[in-house]
A protein has these predicted regions:
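Active-site histidine-anchored catalytic micro-motif
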Residues: 169
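A short, small-residue-rich loop immediately preceding and capping a beta-strand
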Residues: 155-161, 183-189, 553-559
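Conserved "HGTGT" condensation-loop signature of ketosynthase/thiolase-family condensing enzymes
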Residues: 1-155, 175-178, 194, 202-223, ...
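Internal active-site segments that recognize and position negatively charged phosphoryl groups
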Residues: 172, 541
C-alpha cells in the first residue's frame, strides 16, 4: 500500500480573491489586497489590512444561510474555502456512493468567534439578548459549525498554535492518514479580523502603517489579514482508484519549537531551522532540491532576521528563490499555513515565483527575496509557518512522490505507558510553584500558567524525565483570564494604549510554549482546542508520535480556567462548567522501551 499523501482539492478565500483562479490572477499581476479596512469596525484606519471583500451577509448568501442567522466571520470564511475544496475533490459524490470512508476535518484558528464576542461583550452583564453568541466564542465550536454545515465529516478537531495552526492541521492530517485512522482529511485554517486581534498586535508595536515589505531593511512591521484555505489529503492509491485529480504531494513536514520567547524568535532561528531540515529529510531530499521557498516573512524586524538566519543555515550558498506572499494577503495568522500552501500549489502548477512586493533595500544579514520569476520549473516547494511561542512548522509540497521512505507506524516500540500523572485543582497547591521558579516570576504568572507549569514539572520529575521529546497541550478556552482583561480594556478604555501582556498571554498555545521555553524542549509542540474533546485528541496525537518510532516520551497536558464572568455566562446558557476556577492535569507518556 502506497504511503504517498496527495492533495486532491483546494479552496481559498483571501484579500486577493475568492477561489484559486482569482488568487492566481492577483499573484501574476503583482496586485496586493492590502488596503483600508471596510468591514472591520475599528478606529485604526491608519493601519492597512488584508480584508476579504465580502460582508458577512454576502457570505451567508453564497453559502445558502439565512441572513438572520448569527455566525462568526471565522466560520463563514472557513465554510467558503471548504466548499471549494470539497467540490474540487469530489468527496461529496464519494460519500454518496461509499459510506465506509472515514473523513475528518481539521481546522486551525486562534480568534474563533471573537468578532461576535467583542461586538456584544458590553451587554453580557445587562441581559441575555446576545449571550447565545458565546457558544461560538471558542475555537472548537467554529470548527463544529463548519463541519455540521456540510454533513460530510465523521470527526473534526481544532488546532491553535498561533500562526502555524493551519500548517499543523495539515501535518496532523498526514499522520492520521499514514496511521490508517482516516481515509480522507480536509485540513487547513480560517481566521477573521477582529478589534481584539488588531489592537493586540498593535500593542506589540509591530504593525506597519504602509503595505508591509518583507525582508526589506526599512521594514516596519506586518499588516494583519484574514481568510481561509483548506486542502483535501488522501493516499495516492485511493485517490487514483476513485479517479481524483492530483494537484500535488505532501512529501515532507516538520514541527519544532524555538523554545526561546513568547513573541520573539531566536537570533539563529533554531526552531525554524529544525522544522525545515526535518521536512526536507522526511521528503528524502537535499536542500538543493528545493525550487522555491514560500517564507513566513512577516516583515517584522525580528522574524525576517531570524528566518533569514535559519534559511542561510539550511541552504548555505545554494539559496533557492525565496519570497513572502504576506505582502499580498496580509498576515492571516492561523490561516496563513494553508493559504500559503494553496499559493505554493499554484506557483508549482503554473511555473512561477510570486514577487516579494515592496522590497527595495537589502538587510545586512538578510536573504535577498525574489521579485518574481516567470517560466520557473518548480518540483518542490518549502512552505514555512512560524508562530508565537516558537511553534514552527514547515511543509514540502511536491510535483511528484517522494522516495516513500516514510513507512507505517513501527510495530516494535513496546506498549505505550503512563509514567506519571499529576492533577492540580486547588489554589493552595499553586504555592509549590516557588520550588521551581523565582518569586518575582511566580507573582507575574496567572493561575493557569502556574498550574500548567507546576503540574508538568512535577509529572516529569516523578517520571524521571528532564526534557520530553514532544509537548502536546489540550485547552478548551486557553488563557481566558487575559482574554477577558483585554476585552474589558477595549470596552472601557477604547482602542488605545492596550496592555501587550494581556495579548501575549491570550493565545491558546501560550501554555504549551511556556512549558517548552522552561524545559528548552525543541521537539514537536502543538495545542488542541476543541472543547471537551481536546484531551482525547492530544492523547491520540501523542500515541501517533510514539507509534511512529521517532518519539519516546511525550508530555500531554489539559489546562483550563474559568473566570467569574464566564461561569455566569455558561450557567445562563445551561452549559456545564468545571467546579474550580482552574484545572490542570499533566501526563507523561512513553513507549516503554
Amino acid at each position: 500500500m502506497s504511503n504517498n499523501i496527495v492533495i486532491t482539492g483546494q479552496g481559498i478565500i483571501s484579500a486577493i480573491g475568492v477561489g484559486k483562479e482569482a488568487v492566481l490572477r492577483s499573484l501574476c499581476e503583482g496586485r496586493t489586497g492590502i488596503g483600508t479596512m471596510k468591514h472591520l469596525n475599528s478606529i485604526h484606519h491608519e493601519l492597512p489590512v488584508g480584508e476579504v471583500n465580502l460582508s458577512n451577509d454576502e457570505m451567508k448568501t453564497i453559502l445558502g444561510i439565512d441572513r438572520s442567522t448569527e455566525i462568526s466571520r471565522t466560520a463563514l470564511l472557513g465554510m467558503i474555502a471548504l466548499q471549494q475544496a470539497i467540490d474540487e475533490s469530489g468527496i461529496t459524490t464519494l460519500r454518496q456512493v461509499s459510506t465506509d470512508k472515514h473523513i475528518i476535518l481539521i481546522s486551525g484558528t486562534t480568534v474563533g468567534g471573537m468578532d461576535l464576542t467583542e461586538q456584544y461583550f458590553g451587554s453580557f452583564d445587562q441581559d441575555d439578548s446576545h449571550i447565545e453568541c458565546m457558544r461560538q466564542h471558542d475555537c472548537g465550536s467554529n470548527t463544529e459549525l463548519m463541519a455540521n454545515h456540510f454533513g460530510l465529516f465523521d470527526e473534526c478537531t481544532t488546532i491553535s498554535t498561533a500562526c502555524s495552526s493551519a500548517a499543523n492541521a495539515i501535518i496532523l492530517a498526514a499522520n492520521l492518514i499514514k496511521a490508517g485512522q482516516a481515509d480522507i482529511v480536509v485540513a487547513g485554517g480560517t481566521e477573521a479580523l477582529s478589534r481584539f486581534h488588531l489592537n493586540g498586535f498593535n500593542s506589540l508595536q509591530i504593525l506597519d502603517k504602509n503595505v508591509c515589505r518583507p525582508f526589506d531593511d526599512e521594514r516596519m512591521g506586518l499588516n494583519l489579514g484574514e481568510g481561509a484555505a483548506f486542502i483535501v489529503l488522501e493516499r495516492e492509491d485511493e485517490a487514483r482508484r476513485r479517479g481524483a485529480d492530483i494537484y500535488g504531494y505532501l512529501t515532507g513536514y516538520g514541527n519544532a519549537c524555538d523554545a526561546f520567547h513568547q513573541t520573539a524568535s531566536s537570533e539563529n532561528g533554531d526552531g525554524a531551522f529544525m522544522a525545515m531540515t526535518t521536512a526536507i529529510e522526511m521528503a528524502g531530499l537535499h536542500p538543493e532540491h528545493i525550487d522555491y521557498v514560500n517564507a513566513h516573512g512577516t516583515a517584522t524586524p525580528n522574524n525576517d532576521l531570524s528566518e533569514s538566519a535559519a534559511l542561510k543555515r539550511v541552504f548555505k550558498n545554494q539559496m533557492p528563490p525565496v519570497s513572502s506572499t504576506k505582502c499580498y494577503t496580509g498576515h492571516t495568522t492561523s490561516a496563513s499555513g494553508s493559504i500559503e500552501a494553496v499559493i505554493s500549489l499554484l506557483a508549482m502548477k503554473h511555473g512561477f515565483v510570486p514577487a516579494n512586493l515592496g522590497w527595495k533595500n537589502p538587510m545586512p544579514e538578510g536573504i535577498i527575496p525574489s521579485m518574481g520569476i516567470e517560466n520557473h520549473e518548480i518540483n518542490h516547494v518549502l512552505c514555512n509557518s512560524f508562530g508565537f511561542g516558537g511553534n514552527d512548522s514547515s511543509l514540502i509540497i511536491s510535483r511528484f512522490a517522494a522516495t516513500d521512505k516514510e513507512n507505517a507506524p513501527k510495530s516494535n516500540i513496546g506498549d505505550i505507558t503512563v509514567l506519571a500523572q499529576v492533577e492540580i485543582t486547588d489554589e493552595s497547591e499553586l504555592e509549590e510553584i516557588r520550588n521551581y521558579v523565582k518569586p518575582l516570576e511566580a507573582r507575574r504568572m496567572g493561575k493557569i500558567m502556574k498550574s500548567s507549569l507546576l503540574s508538568s514539572l512535577k509529572a516529569l520529575e516523578i517520571a524521571g524525565i528532564d526534557t520530553p521529546d514532544a509537548i502536546i497541550t489540550a485547552t478548551a478556552w486557553g488563557c481566558l483570564d487575559y482574554s477577558e482583561r483585554l476585552l474589558k480594556q477595549l470596552q472601557e478604555e477604547g482602542e488605545a494604549l492596550l496592555k501587550p501582556t494581556y495579548f501575549m498571554q491570550s493565545t491558546h498555545n501560550t501554555i504549551g510554549s511556556n512549558i517548552a521555553i522552561r524545559l528548552k524542549c525543541h521537539g514537536y509542540n502543538v495545542t488542541y482546542t476543541h472543547g471537551e474533546k481536546s484531551l482525547d485528541w492530544a492523547i491520540r496525537d501523542a500515541k501517533l508520535l510514539i507509534q511512529s518510532g521517532k518519539y519516546k516520551t511525550v508530555l500531554v497536558g489539559v489546562h483550563d480556567e474559568v473566570t467569574p464572568m464566564m461561569r455566569s455566562l455558561m450557567e445562563r446558557l445551561g452549559i456545564k462548567v468545571m467546579p474550580s476556577s482552574f484545572y490542570s492535569k499533566a501526563i507523561v507518556m512513553s513507549c516503554g522501551r
